[in-house]
Amino acid sequence: TLSRGLGDVYKRQMSIGRTFKESMQKALRSLETGRHGFGWDGKDPAGPSREDIERKLHVPNCERIYWIKVAFEHGWSVEDLFEATQIDRWFLVHLKEIADEGANLADLDLRRAKKLGFSDKQIALARGESEDSVREKRKGVGILPTYRLVDTCAAEFEAYTPYYYSTYGDENEARNSDKKKIIILGGGPNRIGPVSYTHLRAHETESN
């Protein structure tokens, strides 16, 4: 079962994007809670009162992030949210920017929407279209994922084991190669990412 409290237990979610806004929406999707980002997925609460919002914001848990979006939609300011949650204003400012842009998601430029981390599913629901329709329109105008390099050596010397993340920028840093390629699929809650698990899966693959 999914523990919904935070407390002092170490929990994390990792995602990489060009901006915090893109990374945040990617992280929320990867939680596998049925949400497709920072809302706009048909699962936001309908007609909550101010008391409902205050109560949900008061206790840190895995649902509070979505209530921050609801609060912005109901006219709360960054300062209101800071007073209610004590979350650093830097994060709240960026979350508000997502909320402000998402309010016009149905009419938002597709490239802009993708750079903000909105999924095809979110865009489809906002526009009353199918996810496949949005994807085909996006591909038809050349809005495709690009891949950016994560420099594991901080530019001190060439990285021979870099990794990449997908985004919707203009520059693609993926290196083309004719070498034989292997895809390692990680299942379960840890998948691929934590160094120890990745290391074990890589050696397991080499031994087969």
Language model segments and positions:
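Single conserved hydrophobic/aromatic residue that forms the stacking wall/gate
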Residues: 1-6, 10, 199, 206-208
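Solvent-exposed alpha-helices and their adjacent loops that cap or buttress functional pockets
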Residues: 7, 61, 116, 157, ...
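Feature marking long nucleic-acid-engaging regions of large polymerase/nuclease enzymes
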Residues: 11-15
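Ordered, soluble secondary-structure elements with a strong preference for glycine-centered loop motifs
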Residues: 17-18, 196
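Terminal amphipathic helices with adjacent charged low-complexity linkers/tails
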Residues: 18, 22-63, 69-74, 80-155
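Residue-level preference for nonpolar/small residues embedded in alpha-helices
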Residues: 63-64, 130, 188, 201
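ATP-binding N-terminal substructure of ATP-dependent carboxylate-amine bond-forming enzymes
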Residues: 136-139, 145, 150-201
